[in-house]
Amino acid sequence: MRIGIFIDDYLPSVHGVATSTTNLKEALEALGHEVYVIAPRSKTYEDDDDHIIRVPSAKNYVFDKRETGVIYPGLARRLDKYEFDIVHSQMQFYVGVLAHSVAKRQNIPHVTTVHTLYTELIDDYPLMVTAGIIALTAALPIALRTRPILPTPSREQLRTMSKDAIKETFSHQGWRLTAAFANKCDACISPSNHLARILIEEGGLTAPCYVHPNGIDTKRYRVADPSDSPIKKNPGEKFIISVARLSPEKRQKALIEAMPHIPDQSIKLVLTGGGPYEQELRMRAEELDVSQR
């Protein structure tokens, strides 16, 4: 098959959805399929794969200064020449809407994967998440030709609402929007039963939903030599290990802040990964005098 995978934030960004998309592309290609990734153009990154199609983008200062896809009339038509057999959106934003338009134009199936508990990010990225929900509240019904989805509270209402009430309101709104997008697709994929249940119960998902965890290429780790590890375990030591991108929503800071409350000095914390939060985490460990633990 010729497959188009649509994603709103791809390389050089480092996060789980981008990694999952790359793994999916490679796995499908290994099975003999022809796979294209459609993503916003990056001004700082050159692709070495002619099966990555970049669409126009603009820097979005609300969304962490990332390049956001700029969708305009006629863009879906430019992709007609690829004659996809199926499209698969990995995110439900601008480029995700483009996937919807391409599927409609080419009369082909559209599958979407909801990877992220977006509403769990409100505490860590309040401006980014709430601004995104407000923007999608206005734009998504127009793009999908569906009825309006839950009016966003007015500025006056927001002033009188507690933080928890605001979070609950935007959380519910976010799931309704995500499910509304998925309901316009032929099928929805969730990496976990928990996320699928939220989409159905809170979002109102009615499209067929399949739980399919993201895979890991275990061959990359089978050749590892334990003697090369930078971590040396002494007799009697116990390790708390976190393997994740270093970013606020992964809660590594809470692990560091818990270490001073663990009197047993044989217990060590190992954070494995990289990301934008690394320097802040190192500084916090120094402040609490646990950098050697």
Residue ranges and their predicted role:
Residues 1, 224-239:
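Nucleotide-sugar donor-binding and catalytic loop/hinge architecture
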Residues 1-56, 82:
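N-terminal subdomain of nucleotide-sugar transferases
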Residues 41, 194, 215:
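Carbohydrate-associated surface elements
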Residues 61-89, 94-101, 105, 172-176:
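An amphipathic, basic-hydrophobic alpha-helix
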Residues 200, 216-230:
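Acidic anion/phosphate-binding donor-loop and adjacent secondary structure
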Residues 279-293:
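Nucleotide-activated donor-binding/catalytic signature segment of Leloir-type glycosyltransferases, i.e.
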